[in-house]
């Protein structure tokens, strides 16, 4: 559960309505894989991830990034039940994929950076603060199965 004020919820949903999920998702996952290269081990089937340009131009990275942000978008519709919303994904990432839950936090922080880059002055400190709460809540929900 994420505790957001009415103003914070409005800020999050207003900005999210302008997000190009495909573009932002691909860039977010791509940046995660470049900045934190150890995360690439979960994506060995994606082909060439040898350079930053290879990662950022990789169609499988872009497609999976879109999928990740589509799930995040679903979470924004259920901020009061993130654990329930992400229960199956938490189980998958814990039991089958064995993803370090810290990676969820890293991904959330990269998403905030990408949103800041895309929205510039519109991504005010207040909007960032609200998004930091949301990505922390999503990361905690995804890590829930690990506890």
From Swiss-Prot:
Modified residues (Phosphothreonine): 13
Residues recorded as bearing N6-acetyllysine in the entry: 60, 83, 145
Keywords recorded for this protein, A-Z: Acetylation, Heme, Iron, Metal-binding, Oxygen transport, Phosphoprotein, S-nitrosylation, Transport
One GO location term (cellular component): haptoglobin-hemoglobin complex
Entry's Gene Ontology BP terms: hydrogen peroxide catabolic process
Molecular function (Gene Ontology), one example: metal ion binding
KW Magnesium (keyword) present: no
Cytoplasm in keyword set: no
Modified residues (N-acetylvaline): 2
InterPro entries the UniProt entry points to: Globin, Globin-like_sf, Globin/Proto, Hemoglobin_b, Hemoglobin_oxygen_transport
Binding site for heme b: 64, 93
Coiled coil, from the record: none
Domain (Globin) ranges: 3-147
Signal sequence extent: none
Tissue: Red blood cells.
Subunit structure: Heterotetramer of two alpha chains and two beta chains.
The family this protein is said to belong to: Belongs to the globin family.
Protein's UniProt name: Hemoglobin subunit beta
Species of origin: Lepus europaeus (European hare)
Source lineage: Eukaryota, Metazoa, Chordata, Craniata, Vertebrata
């Amino acid at each position: 559960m994420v505790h957001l004020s009415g103003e914070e919820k409005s800020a999050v949903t207003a900005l999210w309505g302008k997000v190009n999920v495909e573009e932002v998702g691909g860039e977010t996952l791509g940046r995660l894989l470049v900045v934190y290269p150890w995360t690439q081990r979960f994506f060995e089937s994606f082909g060439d991830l040898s350079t930053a340009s290879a990662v950022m131009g990789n169609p499988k990275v872009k497609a999976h990034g879109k999928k990740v942000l589509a799930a995040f978008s679903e979470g924004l519709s259920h901020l009061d039940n993130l654990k329930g919303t992400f229960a199956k994904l938490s189980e998958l990432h814990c039991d089958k994929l064995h993803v370090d839950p810290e990676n969820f936090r890293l991904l959330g922080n990269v998403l905030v950076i990408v949103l800041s880059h895309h929205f510039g002055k519109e991504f005010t400190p207040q909007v960032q603060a609200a998004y930091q709460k949301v990505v922390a809540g999503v990361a905690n929900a995804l890590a829930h199965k690990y506890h």
